[in-house]
Amino acid sequence: MNFKAGFMTCNQRKPDWLKIKLPTGELSQEVSNTIKIHKLNTICTSGKCPNQGECWRCGTATFMICGNICTRACKFCNVPTGCPLPLNPNEPMEIAQSVEALKLKHVVLTSVDRDDIKDFGASHWVKVIRAVKQKTPNVTMEVLIPDFQGHEDLVSMIIEAKPEVISHNLETVRRLSPHVRSRATYDTSLKVLKQIADSGLVCKSGIMLGLGETRAEILETMDDLRKINCKVMTIGQYLRPSIKNIEVKEYVRPEVFEEYKQIGLEKGFSFVESGPLVRSSYHAEKHVLS
């Protein structure tokens, strides 16, 4: 392993700071059982999230709606790509019942991309949000949405459903975006985020490190987000979920993540979650207050 400027060049062995705990305990089992009973999808499992153990022990989970097969093929993502099944009309109520059964105080929703549907799944998104709010009106909500191919009217549908936080991830810096993301552009994502921020709702985005980006590019991405008044940013280490995915270029040391957190706060973000194991929904309940 070679060390330089806070980075560890990648080989097949992960550094010690990336060791994670497997999901254990009663609350973790309860979440797992509820998900199985209602035949739900979670990004916790589909995306091989390293925080699954921590979140499930706290009785929280990020539900993935619109199926578990994505119409895009981003090189970093572990979610299967292909031709999805039709949307499940019972999903809104099933999600709402699960949120109630788990006694969640804050829920995070995300989805696969559904480019096969006329409205890319936006109306289904609204049905799920409304079902959860009707069933559990005191539960706060974050929604991590796709880009809806940049259609403002579809993004407006999500805004009008009034979740407390709307998140959309840039995923990486501008230069790497065409190589890492599938059928998505950096500028389209910024446009979506600006529309969210302009609505007055909490706007949130995130990027992964370790894909070959430079420090200057990371700071430029922060500036791009602050220019459109994005309030919350997450920064985490990219971890290759399988040999089919893009390789990790480097492992960023924890102290470098902490430095980026401080820089982000100085640039005006209300919250910056930055660490090797940070993912989009990490400590998501805090971001409602931003």
Curated annotation (Swiss-Prot):
Pathway: Protein modification; protein lipoylation via endogenous pathway; protein N(6)-(lipoyl)lysine from octanoyl-[acyl-carrier-protein]: step 2/2. [4Fe-4S] cluster 1 binds at C44, C49, C55, S281. InterPro entries: Aldolase_TIM (IPR013785), Elp3/MiaA/NifB-like_rSAM (IPR006638), Lipoyl_synth (IPR003698), rSAM (IPR007197). It is found in: Cytoplasm. Binds 2 [4Fe-4S] clusters per subunit. One cluster is coordinated with 3 cysteines and an exchangeable S-adenosyl-L-methionine. SMART domains: Elp3 (SM00729). This is Lipoyl synthase. It comes from Treponema denticola (strain ATCC 35405 / DSM 14222 / CIP 103919 / JCM 8153 / KCTC 15104).
